[in-house]
């Protein structure tokens, strides 16, 4: 009994004309999408608009899963062994970095208890206690000094508005910046009043240690930290 094997069908490949035609049909839509993403990434800062910043974080958060899916797709439909090898390496690197992101974010969440720990842009979280309310916001760089400003009751930290109804007397003696591996404590070194309801304070980095913020902290206990 004889068996017949069917020859594999030809692999379809785009021609240059088809690629040009595809770009002509989708160029406008792709341009709008890329322009939108560029504007969000360019102007998405907490000091400008919290809504735009959150959208920026969502876009950055979706980048790694999208890259992993594309790398896996390249592994399945590799053009040759060279492309397959590079695709496997890129997939492994993407998955490892994605896992490292979650590990670091969970460690930072344990230290601060804030969902800002899952911010994909930075692992620096500034924490300040104002009248029993702890405000947590991400900061991009590792600053040696931090500036708190009160303008007619409006409270700003590093240029980011955090709340209203505060005075200079409400500013704490210490501010902390949480990182994955340690917690930096900043001590208030300078306080200046511009008028009766406005002024600013400068905090200088004074201590670094392996601490976490307590979940419940009594009023005025600015230096109470829990070692981990």
Curated annotation (Swiss-Prot):
<dbReference type="Pfam" id="PF01635">
    <property type="entry name" value="CoV_M"/>
</dbReference>
<feature type="topological domain" description="Intravirion">
    <location>
        <begin position="107"/>
        <end position="228"/>
    </location>
</feature>
<dbReference type="GO" id="GO:0044178">
    <property type="term" value="C:host cell Golgi membrane"/>
</dbReference>
<keyword id="KW-1040">Host Golgi apparatus</keyword>
<dbReference type="GO" id="GO:0039660">
    <property type="term" value="F:structural constituent of virion"/>
</dbReference>
<feature type="topological domain" description="Virion surface">
    <location>
        <begin position="2"/>
        <end position="25"/>
    </location>
</feature>
<comment type="subunit">
    <text>Homomultimer. Interacts with envelope E protein in the budding compartment of the host cell, which is located between endoplasmic reticulum and the Golgi complex. Forms a complex with HE and S proteins. Interacts with nucleocapsid N protein. This interaction probably participates in RNA packaging into the virus.</text>
</comment>
<keyword id="KW-0261">Viral envelope protein</keyword>
<feature type="transmembrane region" description="Helical">
    <location>
        <begin position="26"/>
        <end position="46"/>
    </location>
</feature>
<keyword id="KW-1043">Host membrane</keyword>
<feature type="topological domain" description="Intravirion">
    <location>
        <begin position="47"/>
        <end position="56"/>
    </location>
</feature>
<keyword id="KW-0899">Viral immunoevasion</keyword>
<dbReference type="InterPro" id="IPR044362">
    <property type="entry name" value="M_HCoV-like"/>
</dbReference>
<comment type="function">
    <text>Component of the viral envelope that plays a central role in virus morphogenesis and assembly via its interactions with other viral proteins.</text>
</comment>
<keyword id="KW-0468">Viral matrix protein</keyword>
<dbReference type="GO" id="GO:0016020">
    <property type="term" value="C:membrane"/>
</dbReference>
<keyword id="KW-0812">Transmembrane</keyword>
<protein>
    <recommendedName>
        <fullName>Membrane protein</fullName>
    </recommendedName>
</protein>
<keyword id="KW-0946">Virion</keyword>
<dbReference type="InterPro" id="IPR002574">
    <property type="entry name" value="M_CoV"/>
</dbReference>
<keyword id="KW-1133">Transmembrane helix</keyword>
<dbReference type="GO" id="GO:0055036">
    <property type="term" value="C:virion membrane"/>
</dbReference>
<keyword id="KW-0945">Host-virus interaction</keyword>
<feature type="transmembrane region" description="Helical">
    <location>
        <begin position="57"/>
        <end position="77"/>
    </location>
</feature>
<feature type="transmembrane region" description="Helical">
    <location>
        <begin position="86"/>
        <end position="106"/>
    </location>
</feature>
<keyword id="KW-0325">Glycoprotein</keyword>
<dbReference type="GO" id="GO:0019031">
    <property type="term" value="C:viral envelope"/>
</dbReference>
<keyword id="KW-0472">Membrane</keyword>
<comment type="similarity">
    <text>Belongs to the betacoronaviruses M protein family.</text>
</comment>
<feature type="topological domain" description="Virion surface">
    <location>
        <begin position="78"/>
        <end position="85"/>
    </location>
</feature>
